[in-house]
Amino acid sequence: MESSAKRKMDPDNPDEGPSSKVPRPETPVTKATTFLQTMLRKEVNSQLSLGDPLFPELAEESLKTFEQVTEDCNENPEKDVLTELGDILAQAVNHAGIDSSSTGPTLTTHSCSVSSAPLNKPTPTSVAVTNTPLPGASATPELSPRKKPRKTTRPFKVIIKPPVPPAPIMLPLIKQEDIKPEPDFTIQYRNKIIDTAGCIVISDSEEEQGEEVETRGATASSPSTGSGTPRVTSPTHPLSQMNHPPLPDPLGRPDEDSSSSSSSSCSSASDSESESEEMKCSSGGGASVTSSHHGRGGFGGAASSSLLSCGHQSSGGASTGPRKKKSKRISELDNEKVRNIMKDKNTPFCTPNVQTRRGRVKIDEVSRMFRHTNRSLEYKNLPFMIPSMHQVLEEAIKVCKTMQVNNKGIQIIYTRNHEVKNEVDQVRCRLGSMCNLALSTPFLMEHTMPVTHPPDVAQRTADACNDGVKAVWNLKELHTHQLCPRSSDYRNMIIHAATPVDLLGALNLCLPLMQKFPKQVMVRIFSTNQGGFMLPIYETAAKAYAVGQFEKPTETPPEDLDTLSLAIEAAIQDLRNKSQ
């Protein structure tokens, strides 16, 4: 060993100059340290092209593991281990799709691992990138100027994990034999199959146009027990295949638009009557048909359903029909109309061919007045003679002199004017605080068609009255008509008093209304038979009033007389003093 020998120039590190020191023997630790330092310097001076699309893809036969690269470098001294290893690393990173923006100081992968172990004992972890093409050589900084060199002095570990391809979605194959033809759409009603051409598809109003109407399949498949409930079986055809012309309703449902609502603001019965008729159906029994359709077609190409309904829903399930507009509140007074009862009993009404127009109706136009309509006979003023206040008071005084008013009463009739109604309500409130009164709620009067009886009918009736009770009982003179009854829009109210005191007191509250509204309010006295009071609780008060007129008033105690005389004397004395 010569002491003056100089170390040769390191081709991998040209910055290092010749040294006069004697080279030390290389140990495995020294070799590993030198390898790491050289690798770090190589990384600083060079640049890895990560994810550059300029790398060409190689065939799978050119892929090499870490051991193959080491053996190849040992056989060929011209090849550098670091260069070959760097090419493999760059190729793996490029195949994994990692670019410089996503790389940090530490990259993680399962295919390549670089450690500080000696070169003669390679680690068991090797570079094995399966099904990953390797690029040829690492790119230079000129080819990818966006890459920046990594400046670090620590050993690093690069682990690259190739992307996992998405798992293919396996769709089951449908055999042609498995596709069965869909059954036809049938409706069975009362053990009879109804042709679908007679069905009317009813959808909701503006809210559900263009949308699908969803109905539960349980409603369609549930068995119907009633005789009037139809049964639906296997509805599968789309609505686009059921474009049949609409036919009349086989159940005889009345037309909802045939009747007009009343324009009277006070006669709420006429306004709400047309809406109540829409909610009713014929008495032949309710029926509901629900059919759901699968597949494309119908409204907007989506799965849709159709609904045919009339009457009430079956008690087996919930209502699945289209929502209807809520009707106005119908009072008990409106439901008890004679016209509504006649309609419920299926009484036929004759519809005269008359011209309907606004304005007054003459007395002789009976057919126009009693046509089949829901409107009331409207009157701005009362259509009959109104008695004067003096006549009403004279009749009341004549009744009160008899000391019994159980067969008399007060009737108040007023129009639908808003101001009149407010005044009448105030009087009703005051009447409710009085004693011994029976008050009725306001009610309507319904009128039928007028007719003039021939002379022979009048003669038979007069003869029966002359013959006595038996002849009148056997008299059968019932003259009917087929026109619709009409109700007037004015209101009626009855007041029944127990004693003359209460009758005159109630009359004093009602007569000012007649004086304030002479054409809109009428008060009159009516008579009944010798029946009792509305309730027997008033009989004691009525008898006490009759007996009280003949009883002498109780005498005033002496002390009260003395006190009264003293008060009179004191008052006289005061007057004398003032006069002086």
From Swiss-Prot:
Keyword Endoplasmic reticulum found: no
Comp. bias regions, Low complexity: 216-236, 259-271, 302-317
Cross-link (Glycyl lysine isopeptide (Lys-Gly) (interchain with G-Cter in SUMO)): K175, K180
Biased composition (Polar residues): 99-133
Keyword field: Activator, DNA-binding, Early protein, G0/G1 host cell cycle checkpoint dysregulation by virus, G1/S host cell cycle checkpoint dysregulation by virus, Host nucleus, Host-virus interaction, Isopeptide bond, Metal-binding, Modulation of host cell cycle by virus, Phosphoprotein, Transcription, Transcription regulation, Ubl conjugation
UniProt free text on domains: The SUMO-interacting motif (SIM) is required for efficient transactivation function.
Protein name (database record): Viral transcription factor IE2
